[in-house]
């Protein structure tokens, strides 16, 4: 008489084999971390204020950048995804590694970049090439004349009846060995040693007296350098010290630096 198979015994054996296999897999997973698991274990209090190297056996902080409204948000997160620190940086200004490390010290604040926008320009060396224009006059888009203000250290724009008061300029060309698309120049009041000097946004340009025409301009002296650009009959002078600002005028006001309207930033030269 043939033996009837014991179905319950087969199911029991199958269950036992699967249990052993499952136990082996569980044991393996407990003793081997995934290759992609950058960190594990709890985040210790003593490392919340420090940056540590990114190794698979250590807890680390990750810096993430999100771009929104011309801002950079830098976040430090734990291995559990919790945001520990957050800082905002201006997107259009440079920031350094020190700025990133500073995340660990403040919960949230706006970083004032340690490098001013013109700091890179200050590292350039401008060498005198030659004089390119002599005794020329500048008129703005309202056809106002440029003349020396009563304080003798500023320039002013207005419509003059006596054109003898109108300032004449000399222009000197320089070479920086940098961007060939830019044309660095200095502007000097003719027959004087007064050079036009940039002072900042909406601030009047200063007439700085220099004993002789500078042959080499570096560092803080880059306030004397302007990038001359000519488009058709319009001339523009962008400050090397303040790269987003140009020499500008308003109606009957001192010559200053501005980004554009309501100031006028184009000039006619004759």
Swiss-Prot record:
Positions bearing N6-acetyllysine: 85
Recorded GO CC terms: cell surface; cytosol; extracellular space; nucleus
Phosphoserine modified-residue sites: 90
One Pfam short name: IL1
Domain of life: Eukaryota
SMART domains in UniProt: IL1
Record protein name field: Interleukin-1 alpha
Lineage: Eukaryota, Metazoa, Chordata, Craniata, Vertebrata
Gene label: Il1a
């Amino acid at each position: 008489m043939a033996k009837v198979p014991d179905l319950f015994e087969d199911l029991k054996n199958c269950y036992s084999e699967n249990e052993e296999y499952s136990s082996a897999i569980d044991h393996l997973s407990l003793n081997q971390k995934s290759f992609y698991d950058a960190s594990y274990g709890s985040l210790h209090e003593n490392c919340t204020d420090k940056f540590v190297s990114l190794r698979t056996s250590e807890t680390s902080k990750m810096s993430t950048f999100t771009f929104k409204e011309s801002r950079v948000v830098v976040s430090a997160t734990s291995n559990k995804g919790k945001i520990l620190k957050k800082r905002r940086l201006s997107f259009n200004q440079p920031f350094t590694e020190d700025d990133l490390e500073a995340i660990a010290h403040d919960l949230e604040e706006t970083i004032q970049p340690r490098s001013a926008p013109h700091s890179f320009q200050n590292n350039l060396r401008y060498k005198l090439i030659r004089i390119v224009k002599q005794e020329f006059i500048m008129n703005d888009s309202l056809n106002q004349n440029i003349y020396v203000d009563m304080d003798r250290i500023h320039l002013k724009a207005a419509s003059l009846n006596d054109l003898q008061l109108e300032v004449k300029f000399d222009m000197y060309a320089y070479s920086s060995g940098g961007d060939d698309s830019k044309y660095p120049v200095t502007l000097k009041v003719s027959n004087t040693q007064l050079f036009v000097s940039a002072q900042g946004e909406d601030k009047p340009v200063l007439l700085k007296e220099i004993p002789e025409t500078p042959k080499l301009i570096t560092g803080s002296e880059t306030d004397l350098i302007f990038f001359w650009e000519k488009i058709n009959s319009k001339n523009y002078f962008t400050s090397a010290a303040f790269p987003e600002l140009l020499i500008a005028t308003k109606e009957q006001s001192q010559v200053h630096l501005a980004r554009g309207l309501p100031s006028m930033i184009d000039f006619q030269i004759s």
